Amino acid sequence: MCGIVGYTGSDIAKNILVTGLKRMEYRGYDSSGVALEVGEGAAAHLDVIRRVGKVAGLESELSNIDSDATCGIGHTRWATHGRPSVVNAHPHTSCDGRIAIVHNGIIENFAELREELEGRGHHFKSETDTEVFAHLIEEAYAETHDLMASVREACTHVVGAYGLAAVCADEPGVIAVARKDSPIVVGVGETGSYVASDVIALIDATRDVVAAITLAVGR
């Protein structure tokens, strides 16, 4: 089972994400990664860092990155579709790299969705089922310019179980989450808001948590 964690607030996001991911290593994993919101205005973008193996390897790589990002999402993966590799590790991104997503669950109709999306010009980088979500959200965002509305629209096309969190470089400080037959909790602490697939990931940050359905979490 995959692990999801997210944070938006005033603290350094990478430290919080790594702590949460390490707490969820008991769920099993073959790779891990984070997406961090970096820059402001026209310079805003997402930094995506992924590693195969233990979260400690990701932590080591992040320790060499001077990042003051205060919003991001992270993931530990247990492979279901696609072999363990950096390319198949989460987060997955849209074609333009402005949207990133982490997901726990199985998308039953991913092959059909992938074929349709590729037919509309989307380029897939991984073997995973999760990546279809990134492209579905990207398509919807081109129309809505609203991350949460785009996540809702993407979910209408998916058959299967999912818990997901998404960020967009054009909506700083916002994490959109949705779930169906897969756990996601949202917590509020003194310095920000948190998202996780397991409450144990948030135990150091807050005890004020609720089960999520579909919502946007902001600072």
Language-model features and meaning:
Residues 1-216:
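Conserved short alpha-helical segments that host acidic/polar catalytic motifs at enzyme active sites
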